[in-house]
């Protein structure tokens, strides 16, 4: 589940930056290790995306029950229950999930994600899972990963982000189009 497709920068002979090019079509990713990512940003992602991340084994039964109850009582089954581990798998194993045609297709994928999440948690540490997730997450405008987001939205290295900048980047995951701080500056999460 390691991310693929990295961001490449081309330099002139004098060392100045010439242009940016993508190795993989549509990719915009600069990999950072977990030690290079601020703890505030890690904590913000966990708080927003999967508050029980350090307590579950890849699936969050409490979250699944909550989402199911909300779906049954409201008729709206859009409530999220995917863990960070499941989202990592979805981003890397099921990249075409948005093209699912039926609710049944979505349920089938979710079951596969849950099985794979349980298996992945046996093979990788929580830190490895979080590191890979933070390097694959779509943060708007096909900006993949936290380093690319730090560069795009704040023109700085991820390690230099302030607490408020960390919360803006983590908040983008809730709705990457709506909370894009470039196109919607008044809606910063």
Q: What are these language model-derived features?
A:
Residues 7, 11-188:
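Peptidoglycan glycan-strand catalytic modules in the bacterial/periplasmic cell-wall system
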């Amino acid at each position: 589940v390691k991310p693929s497709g990295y961001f490449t920068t081309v330099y002139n002979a004098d060392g100045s930056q010439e242009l940016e090019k993508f190795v993989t079509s549509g990719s915009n990713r600069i990999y950072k290790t977990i030690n290079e990512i601020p703890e505030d940003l890690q904590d913000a992602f966990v708080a927003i995306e999967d508050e029980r991340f350090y307590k579950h084994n890849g699936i969050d039964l409490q979250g699944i029950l909550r989402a199911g109850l909300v779906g049954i009582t409201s008729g709206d089954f859009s409530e999220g229950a995917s863990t960070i581990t499941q989202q990592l798998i979805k981003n890397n194993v099921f990249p075409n999930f948005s093209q699912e045609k039926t609710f049944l297709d979505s349920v089938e994928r979710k079951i596969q994600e849950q099985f794979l999440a349980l298996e992945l948690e046996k093979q990788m540490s929580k830190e490895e899972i979080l590191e890979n997730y933070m390097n694959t997450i779509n943060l708007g405008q096909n900006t993949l990963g936290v380093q690319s987001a730090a560069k795009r939205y704040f023109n700085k290295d991820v390690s230099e982000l302030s607490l408020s900048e960390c919360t803006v980047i983590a908040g983008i995951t809730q709705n990457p189009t709506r909370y894009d701080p470039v196109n919607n500056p008044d809606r910063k999460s």
